[in-house]
Amino acid sequence: MTQNLLDQFGTPKTRVKNAISALRYGHGIIVLDNEDRENEGDLIFSGETMTTEQMALTIRYGSGIVCLCITESKRKQLKLPMMVQNNTSKFGTNFTVTIEAAEGISTGVSAKDRLTTIRAAINDNAKPSDLNRPGHIFPLQAHKNGILGRIGHTEAAIEFVTLAGFKPAGIICELTNRNGTMSKVPDIIKFSKLKKMTIVTIRDLIQYISR
């Protein structure tokens, strides 16, 4: 059903190329996962290019849980412990402890403050002391084998931003409806047209990198 609804946005290869191009130009994209998984759509941005306005849009239309997708090496660089030692979440989502920039913010919750935290974390020379814990940004460690190791939005974000030429640091947040429910495909397609955002699936991405 999902693939049929997405045919209007081109072939899977076209959708992936459009998504990569959108990210290169500093835009966000919408990524759908599989129908037999979460069956939800996430807003995805590059941590390097995301603007305060884009963060505000993400907070307004998303769940409010803004996540920073990073590699294991970045997590170790920042000395961020995992949120739990025994991960029992359904899809094995690898949350670390939450973070906040140590400098340059007020309460940490505003769009501007959250972006300041992200920039501090993804800086190539970032040190553990640059971040306070806990905070309002939720880092996620991606699988070491990327999207082929785990079919999740975390890994998709890393794959997409690196394909676009950026460092492996992606921002994700689940889209929600006004009534508080999670957005499903028909709602997500309407949103993508309203905000003129490229829409693509994780299945599209896997086909693209496996070609």
From Swiss-Prot:
Keywords: Lyase, Magnesium, Manganese, Metal-binding, Riboflavin biosynthesis. SUPFAM superfamilies: YrdC/RibB. GO terms for cellular component: cytosol. It catalyses: D-ribulose 5-phosphate = (2S)-2-hydroxy-3-oxobutyl phosphate + formate + H(+). Pathway: Cofactor biosynthesis; riboflavin biosynthesis; 2-hydroxy-3-oxobutyl phosphate from D-ribulose 5-phosphate: step 1/1. Its EC number is 4.1.99.12. Pfam families: DHBP_synthase (PF00926). The record marks 136, 174 as: Essential for catalytic activity. Binds 2 divalent metal cations per subunit. Magnesium or manganese. One of its GO terms (biological process) is riboflavin biosynthetic process. Mg(2+) 2 binds at residues 38, 153. Catalyzes the conversion of D-ribulose 5-phosphate to formate and 3,4-dihydroxy-2-butanone 4-phosphate. Belongs to the DHBP synthase family. This is 3,4-dihydroxy-2-butanone 4-phosphate synthase. The lineage of its organism: Bacteria, Pseudomonadati, Pseudomonadota, Gammaproteobacteria, Enterobacterales.
